[in-house]
Amino acid sequence: MNYFNVGKIVNTQGLQGEMRVLSVTDFAEERFKKGAKLALFDDKDQFAMEVEIASHRKAKNFDIIKFKGMYHINDIEKYKGFSLKIAEENLTDLEDGEFYYHEIIGLDVYENDILIGQIKEILQPGANDVWVVKRKGKKDLLLPYIPPVVLNIDIPNNRVDVELLEGLDDEN
C-alpha cells in the first residue's frame, strides 16, 4: 500500500495528549479532522501503527492534534519525530486541473516538444508553487507553477508542456 506524507510530529503540546504537527498538506482541515484515519511512520520511515484523530485545531504555524485513545503526554511522547501519512485509498478526488504532488513529481517537462528535464521536487515559497526541474548537464531549473509558464499537464502521458518566460532559464 502506498502512503503519502501529510505532516510530522515535532513536539508535544501540554499534558493532555496533544501534539504539534508541522503540516505538509494543502488539506490540513480534512486530513486532521476528527475521525480521520492516518498512519504513523517512525524516523526510519517504517510503518508503526494506524491512528484516528480525536481533535484538531490550528495554533500559530502548527496543527495541534490528539489521537483517539491517547489522552496523556506519556501516551504520545514517544511519537515525536514520527511522520503522519495518509493511505492512497483515503485520498480524495480533486477538481479538474488540481493535482497531488506525487502525480507531478517525476513528470517530463517539454518546451516546444523538446525535453527540458524531469520534475524532481515541489517547493512552496509563497504565492505559488515552484517546480524543481532536473536537467542533464545543467543546474536545476526553478519553474513557477503559473498559467503563462505551465501550459498543459498530461498525467497519463507523463508530460508537462511549458513556455519558459524570459529570465527563467539563466543558462541560455
From Swiss-Prot:
Tree of life domain: Bacteria
GO molecular function per UniProt: ribosome binding
PRC barrel domain residues: 96-168
Pfam families in the cross-refs: PRC (PF05239), RimM (PF01782)
Keyword Cytoplasm set for record: yes
Protein location: Cytoplasm
GO cellular component, one term: ribosome
Keyword rRNA processing included in the entry's annotation: yes
Main localization, broad class: cytoplasm
Keywords: Chaperone, Cytoplasm, Ribosome biogenesis, rRNA processing
Database matches in InterPro entries: PRC-brl_dom, PRC_barrel-like_sf, RimM, RimM_N, RimM_N_sf, Transl_B-barrel_sf
A GO biological process held by the record: ribosomal small subunit biogenesis
PANTHER family: RIBOSOME MATURATION FACTOR RIMM (PTHR33692:SF1)
Assigned protein family: Belongs to the RimM family.
Stated role: An accessory protein needed during the final step in the assembly of 30S ribosomal subunit, possibly for assembly of the head region. Essential for efficient processing of 16S rRNA. May be needed both before and after RbfA during the maturation of 16S rRNA. It has affinity for free ribosomal 30S subunits but not for 70S ribosomes.
Subunit structure, as described in the record: Binds ribosomal protein uS19.
Domain-related comment: The PRC barrel domain binds ribosomal protein uS19.
Designated name of the protein: Ribosome maturation factor RimM
Organism this protein belongs to: Streptococcus suis (strain 05ZYH33)
